[in-house]
From Swiss-Prot:
Gene Ontology molecular functions: metal ion binding; metallopeptidase activity
Protein name stated in the entry: UPF0758 protein Avin_02940
Family, similarity comment: Belongs to the UPF0758 family.
Sequence motif JAMM motif, location on chain: 173-186
PANTHER family: DNA REPAIR PROTEIN RADC, UPF0758 PROTEIN YEES-RELATED
Organism of origin: Azotobacter vinelandii (strain DJ / ATCC BAA-1303)
Amino acid sequence: MGIRDWPAAERPREKLLEQGASALSDAELLAIFLRTGVAGQTAVDLARHLLNDFGGLRALLEADRAAFSRRLGLGPAKFAQLQAVLEMSRRHLAERLRRDPALESPQAVRDYLKARLRHEPHEVFGCLFLDAKHRVLAFEVLFQGTVDGASVYPRQVLKRALAHNAAALILTHNHPSGIAEPSQADFSLTRRLKEALALVDVRVLDHFIVGDGEPLSMAEQGWL
């Protein structure tokens, strides 16, 4: 039986329109994206199979083009569509972040950093550069490393802060392990960057660590 034969309340698209996207399961959301199934499988069946095959929604979203295209029901066109959707989401969050001072919208900061860094397969370190009113001037990924870490050079962070004429900044990096707990190296790096930036009157307001859950704020924990 095809999805069209299901009761209206159970069809993913109708369910989304009636109850909102948050009411749908991962498989139902993916089924709407897929639009059609394959021989012997509805779009929902195919979505469940793909989620199981990849090991979950996050792994599917992080898959490269080669891994994506090897799966039945997917291909270059679907990969391109998915990348476009992800990029639109990131840009939407970036626009939202630029509307208000960063410290007045901490959830916007968290949402943006999650979208920007959570799916990175290797550790990356970046900065949100802020003006004197804590409005976002720019976000840059400054260093990229391995699964285990990234080398960060205070001189380069200082150089980019001066280039943006930033009055303050928010540090961030991801933990590909998914565990957003700071290491001793993270504490040491934060301290060194605070000291270096203080020499040119640039404040470090926070250091967010991005894992699988909500990004951890070192400032909120009293670690700054």
